[in-house]
């Protein structure tokens, strides 16, 4: 029972914390979509290379 007030206070603090989106953008900011696209492209290339090395059918 002693932990309940602490738990409620922590929930209120978390809910009132500013989100990442609330930060001001600068000219150097890059959209996250480009990072995700680059990661997907790199992952796809690795899968194709692995497939070519193992099975020789994907090339």
Swiss-Prot record:
Propeptide residue span(s): 23-44
Subcellular location: Secreted
InterPro entries: T-conotoxin (IPR031565)
Disulphide bridges: 51-58, 52-59
Principal cellular location given in the protein's record: secreted
Cellular component, GO, one term: extracellular region
Gene Ontology molecular function, alphabetical: sodium channel regulator activity; toxin activity
Signal peptide stretch: 1-22
Pfam families named in the record: Chi-conotoxin
Keywords: Cleavage on pair of basic residues, Disulfide bond, Ion channel impairing toxin, Neurotoxin, Secreted, Signal, Toxin, Voltage-gated sodium channel impairing toxin
Tissue occurrence: Expressed by the venom duct.
Keyword Secreted: yes
Record has Mitochondrion as a keyword: no
Miscellaneous comment as given in the Swiss-Prot or TrEMBL entry: Negative results: shows very weak inhibition of neuronal sodium channels rNav1.6/SCN8A (14% inhibition at 200 nM), and rNav1.7/SCN9A (7%).
Physiological role: Mu-conotoxins block voltage-gated sodium channels. This peptide inhibits the cardiac sodium channel hNav1.5/SCN5A (33% inhibition at 200 nM, 50% at 400 nM, and 55% at 600 nM). Does not interfere with the voltage-dependence of activation, but affects the voltage-dependence of inactivation of hNav1.5. In vivo, intracranial injection into 9-day-old mice causes transient symptoms, including extension of the body and clockwise and counter-clockwise turns, that last 3 to 4 minutes.
Domain notes: The cysteine framework is V (CC-CC).
Family per record: Belongs to the conotoxin T superfamily.
Name under which the protein is recorded: Mu-conotoxin SrVA
Native source species: Conus spurius
């Amino acid at each position: 029972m002693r932990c309940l007030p602490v738990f409620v206070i922590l929930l209120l603090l978390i809910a009132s914390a500013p989100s990442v989106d609330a930060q001001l953008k600068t000219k150097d900011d890059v959209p996250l979509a480009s990072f995700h696209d680059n990661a997907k492209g790199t992952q796809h290339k690795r899968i194709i290379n692995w497939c070519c090395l193992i099975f020789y059918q994907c090339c």
